[in-house]
Amino acid sequence: MDTVQSLINITLPQPEIEAPAKLEYDRTRILSIAAVVFLGYLLLRPLFDKRLPLPPAPTRLPLLGNLHQFPASNLWGTYKKWHNQYGPIMGLKYGQRTVISLGSHEVAKDLLEKRSNIYSSRPNFVVAKAFSNDANSALIAYDERWKTHHSLLSTFMNARMAAKYQFLQNIESKQALHDLMSVQGTEWMQVFHRYTISVTFTLAYGERIPELYDERILFIDELTETISSNVEKPKNLIADCFPTISILPSALMRWKKQGKVYHDSAMKFFLDNHAKALQKPGWNWVKESQTSEDANKLDREEVIYLIGVLIEAGGSTMKTFEFFVMASILFPEKVRLVQEEVDRVVGADRLPTWDDSPNLPYLHAFIREVQRWRPIFPFGVPHSNLKEDVYNGFRIPKDSVVLANHWAMDSDHKVFENADDFVPERWLEDSKLPFLAFGYGKRVCPGQHIAKRSLFIIISRTLWAYNITHAYEKGKKVEIDPHAIVQNILAGPVPFKGTFTPRDADRYRILEEEFSNIGQDEANIWDVCKP
């Protein structure tokens, strides 16, 4: 046996120590060669690509596409300039992403409405999905799950239910009008913010938020700011431009951990308020969801998140209120026309109501012009196409990010004469002008019926009650820059100061009386608002 073992040892020597190093060297060579081949493929592919071209755009570089041209500032203005140069549809490349920007109403309608079966999905934004755990109805793909979400939301937000909610909007607007009596500086912004949050919070959870700086409002603000700042961070945008790198571990992709922390924090807030809502004596969205067939098709936590995130979404109307105040200060001659109409129809001894709406055409034109002049979603909410498509000889690859460029469309001089000017009359002179504030096709804003009533009730009553003018400091007028806009996904003006002065003593008295009666009406909210 020892002899056999000796022979084996002689004929089968031990592996050399250098073998692992040699193996590592070979692996490195193979990876290097593969990388060179892949890079060469990417560089040479366009030369042999026989497919239809993408829509025109600034010159693209291999791998990067148009990343080197991504505007560091004035994003919307740059896109509009590009549309003027390249036409109403552009095909940009940001890394692995294809971005199709639609710069005219005609093209947007052709694709997002006439071909809505293709263009009703959402892009797979990996960072945003990490922060929502892929449960935000506004961001999920167009599939059976989205249809269930949409059906559930429709039970809360359809036109019939929105008509019932005006009782609550009436109460909340009276509080807002009273709060405006004592605000200073930029605090008026918080008045409208409280209004929008309290309306949706009351409907969702059965409890009003009467205080301007309630801790729940501050927490919702923190949630909104956290997700906005993280989604728009340049280093996080890289993950959306090159989504394949999202497979890397959390240690390298910090947004994964940040997204989980954010989602857990949001869910705790939603869970706590969801549980409280079930114990409320009156009706609310949480209770309504308990008997919904659509809710039963979804996970419990998904339903809780779906309802909770509506509070944040409802707050977006606040940005339109802020632009309304800006327009009121900058264009007082237009405000006087609104006030003359409201005084003629309503009089001076009561607040406007929704019943007055059909008789206030100039007011409606004024509101529409605010939404056109300063759209709060300058790029809309991005769509995505479920399959490759061809439009006017251009190829639109599957899963493209399709932007309805509201900023370019709403300032298109071919459609809106003197588009840079604030002209409410245009909506009275041409009823066929395109209006896109609430989106396109099957992904229109599900809360639009509630939002329209909120805009009417707040704006009509504010202009009935107040003159809105520049603020003064040390005897000097504080100027407002109409172009000072925060360039986020949701756009709003840079905070500015304004002055709200009751138009006369009688209106001041009426505001006080209406505010004092809120307590009597509050007890009836949930009986009036329920189906």
UniProtKB/Swiss-Prot annotation:
The keyword Oxidoreductase applies. CDD domains: CYP64-like. Keywords: Heme, Iron, Membrane, Metal-binding, Monooxygenase, Oxidoreductase, Transmembrane, Transmembrane helix. This is Cytochrome P450 monooxygenase peniB. Heme binds at residue 445. Its cofactor is heme. GO terms for molecular function: heme binding; iron ion binding; monooxygenase activity; oxidoreductase activity, acting on paired donors, with incorporation or reduction of molecular oxygen. Its EC number is 1.-.-.-. Its main location: membrane. It holds the Pfam family p450. GO terms for biological process: mycotoxin biosynthetic process. Pathway: Secondary metabolite biosynthesis; terpenoid biosynthesis. The keyword Transmembrane helix applies. It comes from the Eukaryota. Cytochrome P450 monooxygenase; part of the gene cluster that mediates the biosynthesis of penifulvin A, a potent insecticidal sesquiterpene that features a [5.5.5.6]dioxafenestrane ring. It catalyses: silphinene-15-oate + 2 reduced [NADPH--hemoprotein reductase] + 2 O2 = gamma-lactone-2-keto[5.5.5.5]fenestrane + 2 oxidized [NADPH--hemoprotein reductase] + 3 H2O + H(+). The chain crosses the membrane at residues 30-48. Disruption phenotype: Abolishes the production of penifulvin A. Belongs to the cytochrome P450 family. It is found in: Membrane. InterPro entries: Cyt_P450, Cyt_P450_CS, Cyt_P450_E_grp-I, Cyt_P450_sf, Cytochrome_P450_fung. It is a single-pass membrane protein.
